[in-house]
């Protein structure tokens, strides 16, 4: 799948996850943690997914998928162990112009979920052409470098930007911020110097 990476505000997003196994559990967790309103459809749920349902109060339809289940869902995850069912979900999602993640056959969907690394305001996503294990491996390598130092420094940088905007200094921020975000930016973070530079910034 070739596509355009975007960062979506998931809070309140209406998500339908069809399936009750390990993949459905992982997807439901990701969306729930992001603040989405997750609804499940599956005859049975894995124990871990049952626990998530109880902990988060997720809505569940304990039966096979039906076309009407799409309802008002804005985003759909097809994660059953039945290729025919997943293909049917894909057709229904396409007919309803909904976003679909097809867990077993990515080409049936119109969006894919990346292997994600987060540190404070920093979010990095990795896609590897439909090979999730490769994406995870690359993500883990990146995570070793882009550690808590980056999260802390970027938190300070974001706070500075917000303060300047609140003070009506948008133009000054745009003019002066390249002095902080220069060719030595990453080196300064890794040496623990960026936060000090921010604190001293006029």
Where are these regions (language model features)?
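Hydrophobic, well-ordered beta-alpha structural blocks that scaffold small-molecule cofactor pockets
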Residues: 1-44, 49-53
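Short beta-strand and adjoining strand-loop segment in the mid-core
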Residues: 35-39, 73-83, 121-130, 144
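Short loop/edge segments at beta-strand edges and connector loops
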Residues: 42, 60-64, 104
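ADP-ribose/adenylate-binding Rossmann-like module
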Residues: 75-81, 86-112
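An accessory alpha-helical subdomain
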Residues: 129-202
């Amino acid at each position: 799948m070739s596509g355009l990476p975007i960062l979506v505000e998931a809070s309140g997003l209406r998500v339908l996850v069809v399936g009750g196994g390990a993949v459905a559990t992982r997807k439901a967790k990701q969306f729930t943690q992001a603040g989405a309103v997750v609804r499940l459809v599956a005859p049975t749920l894995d124990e871990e997914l049952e626990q998530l349902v109880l902990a988060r109060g997720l809505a569940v339809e304990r039966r096979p998928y039906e076309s009407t289940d799409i309802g008002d869902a804005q985003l759909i995850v097809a994660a059953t162990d039945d290729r025919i069912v997943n293909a049917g979900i894909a057709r229904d999602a396409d007919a309803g112009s909904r976003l679909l993640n097809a867990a077993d056959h990515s080409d049936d969907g119109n969006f894919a979920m990346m292997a994600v690394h987060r540190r404070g305001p920093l979010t990095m996503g990795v896609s590897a052409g439909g090979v999730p294990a490769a994406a995870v491996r690359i993500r883990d390598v990146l995570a070793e470098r882009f550690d808590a130092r980056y999260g802390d420094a970027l938190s300070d940088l974001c706070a500075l930007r917000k303060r300047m905007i609140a003070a009506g200094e948008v133009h000054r921020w745009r003019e002066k911020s390249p002095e902080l975000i220069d060719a030595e930016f990453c080196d300064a973070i890794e040496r623990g110097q960026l936060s000090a530079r921010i604190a001293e910034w006029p």
